[in-house]
Amino acid sequence: MSARPEALVAIYADESCLGNGREGDNPGGAGVLLEFRQRDAEPLVRRDLWVSEPATTNNRMALRSVIESMTAISRKGRRFRVTFTTDSRYIVDGMTQWVHDWARRGWTRKAGPIENLELWKQAVAAASEHAVYWRWVRGHAGHAQNEYANDIAVRAAGDQSSSAGLVESGFDAWISARLAKARPTVLEPFPDGAIFRASRTLPTPHPASP
């Protein structure tokens, strides 16, 4: 990674699994909105990213949102400060608490096998490339960027598509349509880099099983 000063990126992520918890193959998707500035005081740049799986769970897709978004920004060849906003307690609690306990125990836990262990390891490895603040918001509460990420995830789950990386965002058109319908919407301001504080440094992921 480049040693240039760490730029700030805001990531909003959500996941969808159609029929989550039901028997059979339940298709799912993960949706991500990224916001950043090329230079200070310039307008925000937005990019979308989405992935899908034909048979999955909400938790798997939440982890995929971390892996895919962190991997995408790592391709820029530099380290970023990242505010990762999600309505998934599974991700926020996992990244700020559980992974540290699991790592101390050699990536095991007393209660039995760790669900989605290999995805957790991949998520930790991908996020460790950056300084990340893990932020939870209540889902479906009018938070514009996360509502948008949810819509991307639902669409990806339904049509089983992938953006194959970062693409131009449709957020501006989406929020204009939402405001025109007078739907409750709170546009999150871009994070203030002057007060950014990363969450606890992630542990080193245990080598993946052969």
Stretches with model-predicted labels:
Residues L44-E53, L117-A125, E168-S176:
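Low-complexity, flexible helical/coil segments
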Residues G158-P210:
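Acidic two-metal-ion nuclease catalytic site recognized across multiple nuclease folds
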Residues E15-E23, P27, I67-Y148, W174:
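RNase H catalytic domain
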Residues E35-R39, N59, W107-A111, G158-S163:
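Glycine-rich loops and low-complexity Gly/Arg-rich segments
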Residues M1-R60, T71-A72, L187-P210:
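RNase H-like nuclease fold core
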Residues A62, V66:
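Short, conserved alpha-helix that lines the donor NDP-sugar binding/gating region
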